[in-house]
Amino acid sequence: MRRLFSSLLFALVFAFSLCLQTSLAQEDPHAAHMAVGYVPREILERALPLRKGVGAVNEKVTTSSTEAQAFYNQGVAYLHSYVWIEAARSFNHALRIDPKLAMAYVGLSRAYSGLEDPKAAREALGKAEALSAGVSEREQRRIAIRAKQLDAMADLPNAAKHLAYKKAIDDALAADMNDSELWLLRGNAEESTAAGRGQRGSAASIAFYERVLKVSPDNFAAHHYLIHSYENLNRVQEALKHGAVYARLAFSVPHAHHMYGHDLRRDGRVEEAIAAFRKADELEHAYYKSENILPDYDWHHPHNLDLLSTSYQYMGKVKEAERLMRETIALAVVSDYREFNKKEWPAFLLARGRTAEALEASLVLAKGKYAGARAIGHVYAGHALLALGRTPEAIDELKAAEKDGQELPRLGAMVTMSSLEPYVEGLRAETYLRSGKMKEGRDILKEVMRKLRAVPGPDAWSQGLFRLEAIARTAREVGDWELAEYAARQMLDHDPAYAGTHYALALVAEHKRDKVAARKAYAAAEKYWRNADADLPELSQVRANAQEQSSTR
């Protein structure tokens, strides 16, 4: 009865979130003009104060007002932390003080791209261009750079346009080698597409951000982007170093604490990571209360909750993990990325053995707004149906996932075909395993595991760990102990500090009648689950099996 209520509650929450997304359009036929992306324009135009702890920026622009200059700098600081709403508010406030501040329109254009509104971004740039005759040559070059970027963003597969964007920055740098904002842009531009904004940097980006630190040693933005770049290279210790600095220099920004939490978790310091994610959450809730802004409009809030909830799941605190996940799914969907990441909920339910609930949640997701969410909903519905022994229906879900997946772009900043592909292939492989085609399923899953582990970034790292665990669990269920051992050893290589890793290894050792290895693995699992829920079923099994192993020594 309780689980039936949970399923009904989830459906109601999802329906409410859809209502929130469409309410503006229903209330006013001109609602599209009243919002930028997914945020009401009224919010973006609200006045705000100058704030401390958001990161220091000192980029001189053409204005006679020191106050307008200060709000412009604050807007740029918020851009570098992806705080799109407050960046837009800061730039709009600067324009109220000085309507001819052309660079504020460039800032608005960048903020509007962050809010996923290319039309509004282009319109804001047009206003900057209209004012360009009255600004310095340096600012004129920046306006031209933004135009090149928008052209390239409108045609992401076009390598020539991406190259033209990078060349425009290079030409501007030739005229001013000490412009830290240009060096930051150049690092962003080194990403795989012109939409790069510091999240997907690599070894090539690092040199540009290191150059910024030579020009501006306490540049918080460079530290922020270096965290992402080092994470993408799996250089956790370097990322941690920059994360600590970013959190110190931008102490009022939730994302700064969140970023530090990323790598504390990767370093095995999960309780410290939880404290960092909690700090971000506290700052966010204080902001929503003081500014009277719904958390639904803040892209960062559900993202932070995702990492916080899965950190609790990692520790075996599944009750708190579930509470936080329910808080997340209650938020309105504002982007394809956000809706796609609602997959964490059915994945969690499957991991907890709550298959019927997982199927219900997956089918809701399969009716989502965006193709990526619909596809991943079908994938998890397929996994749930296979667990329930309903293979023909699971195959139908696989076909539906493939169909929706065809709508996804090959390139982009959010959900792409490559984001979905390992999940679809994982479902295909499970249909083979449960149909007796062990070799076919095993071969596919080994490649899936390789791809999951190759995806960079902290989100992918934790999601990959739980997917490896799910594969190991499925392998045990179908009696493929060779695959179960392979998956468990992949988990060990991926994260030796996870209790679930040692639990999976213990079950394999027990099956092989290797009492010494089983006893060692059970002891490690119990150690790492030392702060887990007291009634965690896996922990109870670990203790019972460990006791049995000891009694038969």
PLM regions and their residue ranges:
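Solenoid-like repeat scaffolds
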Residues: 92, 96-97, 129-133, 173-175, ...
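Residue-level recognition of tetratricopeptide repeat
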Residues: 76, 110, 146, 188, ...
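Alpha-helical segment of the N-proximal tetratricopeptide repeat
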Residues: 64-93, 147-158
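Structural motif corresponding to the intra-repeat A-B loop/turn of tetratricopeptide repeats
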Residues: 81-82, 115, 159, 193, ...
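TPR/TPR-like (Sel1-like) alpha-helical repeat modules
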Residues: 102, 109-133, 265, 274-285, ...
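Generic helix N-cap/helix-start motif at coil->alpha-helix transitions
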Residues: 67-68, 137-138, 217-222, 251-257, ...
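"A position-specific structural signal for the A-helix of alpha-solenoid helical repeats
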Residues: 73, 107, 143-148, 185, ...
